């Protein structure tokens, strides 16, 4: 048994959630077409790095979570590990495993 891993060297733009989702999805599609089982994305790929005070804007963290859900919905067999901003009582630099349309 083998495990084929891809590393997506995309260049996310800080604050451009829509553009970053497009970059992530394009790289994901290439990795899956190449037969990869898992593809890793950069730290905070959804928001761009560093998001700094953008995370304090009303709605930005929620929009980042919606963008992550869009990426997850595109996934099939190949898993994607995607960096995003997680929120609980505090904000966290996190990574989500997305596969089969789910986070």
Which role does the model predict for each range below?
Residues 1-103:
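Hydrophobic structural segments
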């Amino acid at each position: 048994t083998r495990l084929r891993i891809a590393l997506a060297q995309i260049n996310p733009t800080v604050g451009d959630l829509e553009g970053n989702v497009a970059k992530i999805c394009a790289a994901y599609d290439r990795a899956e077409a190449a037969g990869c089982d898992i593809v890793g994305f950069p730290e905070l790929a959804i928001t761009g790095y560093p998001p700094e005070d953008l995370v304090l804007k009303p709605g930005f963290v929620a929009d980042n979570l919606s963008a992550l859900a869009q990426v997850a919905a595109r996934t099939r067999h190949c898993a994607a590990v995607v960096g995003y901003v997680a929120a609980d009582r505090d904000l966290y630099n996190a990574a989500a495993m997305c596969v089969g349309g789910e986070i």
